[in-house]
Amino acid sequence: MKKVSDRILFNLFLNSGLTITEQKEFYKIAKPIIHHKEFVKRCSKDFPHHGSTSLGEHIIKDAIKTYVLAKEYTKTHFLKKADIKIAVLIALFHDLYTKPWQNSDEKTSVFNNDTHGMTHPIEAVLNSYNWFPKYFKNEKDAEIIIDGIIHHMYPYPVRKVENKNIKINNQKLLKKFKYYDYLIQTTKNITKLKIDIRPPKSIEGKLLVKADKLIALSELNSFNSIKALVNGTNKSLAKK
């Protein structure tokens, strides 16, 4: 029996322009992640991300677009290739936050340092490491993936990680996170502000930033879905 994440992926493949060989390459990377119970849960209507598009569908769209961009980059840059697997992993992990954000009981503001928009990349890093530890065994790869996830919202800021008491929904995971020191380093800057604004260091992370913006623009197709980005409330969706 196919999982809902497979049905979403195979439907998106139809208009992706990918060859059968490319689809197989992508699926080999994505399968262990999109089959995980936590990912499958995020493919339901209970996890709307942009408008009524489920979080799982959004992530898969981002990952396919990132894959396409990485292939194009590799074809046109002879001296510096993009690591396609790492790029796709960053895309598959970047929004694995803990709780749905639209119409939640938590008050939100685009100007609040602890709002979902500024903290969800941190939650995504911790959840990805907790659910998929094998992809973080190599320190160099882990740092590229973490940095790509953390800064995927650029030019929107991310919350600085100054200590283990920041307000996030999976804070307990922060206390035992192997790469906690790197998390501090990658969100650090010389200002006194509690936010960091910069793009990912790697080309793989930068490709996701581009893919994410393109996909988000196609999903934010109503006034209410756009307004939700500011106040967290989407009147077009049923109240949780």
Model-derived features with residue positions:
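Metal-dependent phosphohydrolase cores
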Residues: 1-240
